[in-house]
């Protein structure tokens, strides 16, 4: 509890980071809590196609006359969940194999680095388009795994470099001399000293996963099922909403939702870097 109060105190001294933290909480509430209190309105209403913002429809309506605000509320859960899972999978994968490569060294290090180098040479967007077009993933888990497999190489190299520097520290040498085992050395001695680095990378990986997910949905490379901010953008484009004078709200709403959530994440990550780094904190 004292640690949480200290964190909030440090965060309060960074207005941009505090705004980002509040923004993240707002969108998490919007995506996961608000749907319990706001009924889904997905029935087409042809008489209200592309309505301008009003008291009845604060963000206007779409090409089927459905309320845009209602879609924003229900469209956040899918895109945020996939982004979170993709960041989680890629972070765990990179940390595990990056730490093993640095700790074991030798042939294991060479093999892992070789695979990483090959992965880094492949254009990620092209590979993603090909994989998505072939597999046509529709579930949270499959899409998150695909995104994670494209994100891990760059982090793995960074984790390896961090572990290489930590393995020479006195407390790691002491653990090794006590024969505490590889698992203990990596997960009890090294990784706790990298937690700030891991948290910041996780946040940034989530932003990348959300943007990438939005791109492949907008391009129509995966089945358009459920409610999703990116699906709103796809239909806004495919239904020609951009050509209707009063329909810009239908396009602008999901763009702002994605952009503001991403901005909140980046602002929070920047503040966390200041808080976790004593040199930046004292600057």
Enumerate the predicted regions with their spans.
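Transmembrane alpha-helices
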Residues: 77-93, 183-216, 265
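Glycine-rich helix-loop "coupling/hinge" segments at transmembrane-helix boundaries
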Residues: 133-134, 163, 212-253, 257
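N-terminal signal-anchor/first transmembrane alpha helix
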Residues: 1-42, 112-115, 194-195
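Generic hydrophobic transmembrane alpha-helix motif, especially the helices
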Residues: 58, 62, 68, 89, ...
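Periplasmic/extracellular loop-to-transmembrane helix junction in inner-membrane transport proteins
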Residues: 4-13, 42-87, 234-252
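C-terminal transmembrane helix and the adjacent membrane-cytosol boundary/short C-terminal tail
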Residues: 139, 149-150, 196, 202-204, ...
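Transmembrane alpha-helix signature in integral membrane proteins
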Residues: 21, 68-103, 261
């Amino acid at each position: 509890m004292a640690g949480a109060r200290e964190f909030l105190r440090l965060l309060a001294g960074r207005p941009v980071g505090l705004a980002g933290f509040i923004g993240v909480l707002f969108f998490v509430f919007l995506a996961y809590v608000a749907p319990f209190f706001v009924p889904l309105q997905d029935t087409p209403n042809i008489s209200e196609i592309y309505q301008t913002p009003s008291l009845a429809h604060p963000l206007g309506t779409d090409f089927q006359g459905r309320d845009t605000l209602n879609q924003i509320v229900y469209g956040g859960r899918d895109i945020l969940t996939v982004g979170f899972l993709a960041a989680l999978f890629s972070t765990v994968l990179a940390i595990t194999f990056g730490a093993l490569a640095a700790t074991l060294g030798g042939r294991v290090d060479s093999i892992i680095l070789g695979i990483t180098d090959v992965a880094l040479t492949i254009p990620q967007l092209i590979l993603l388009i090909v994989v998505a077009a072939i597999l046509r993933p529709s579930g949270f888990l499959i899409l998150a795994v695909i995104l994670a497999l494209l994100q891990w190489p760059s982090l793995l190299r960074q984790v390896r470099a961090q572990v290489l520097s930590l393995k020479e520290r006195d407390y790691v040498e002491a653990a090794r001399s006590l024969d505490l085992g590889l698992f203990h050395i990596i997960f009890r001695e090294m990784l706790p000293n990298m937690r700030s680095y891991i948290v910041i990378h996780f946040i940034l990986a989530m932003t990348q996963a959300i943007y990438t997910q939005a791109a492949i949905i907008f391009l129509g490379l995966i089945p358009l099922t459920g409610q999703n901010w990116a699906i709103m953008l796809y239909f806004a484009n495919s239904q020609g909403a951009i050509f209707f004078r009063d329909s810009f709200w239908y396009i602008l709403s999901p763009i702002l939702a994605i952009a503001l959530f991403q901005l909140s994440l980046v602002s929070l990550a920047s503040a966390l870097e200041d808080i976790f780094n004593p040199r930046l904190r004292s600057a």
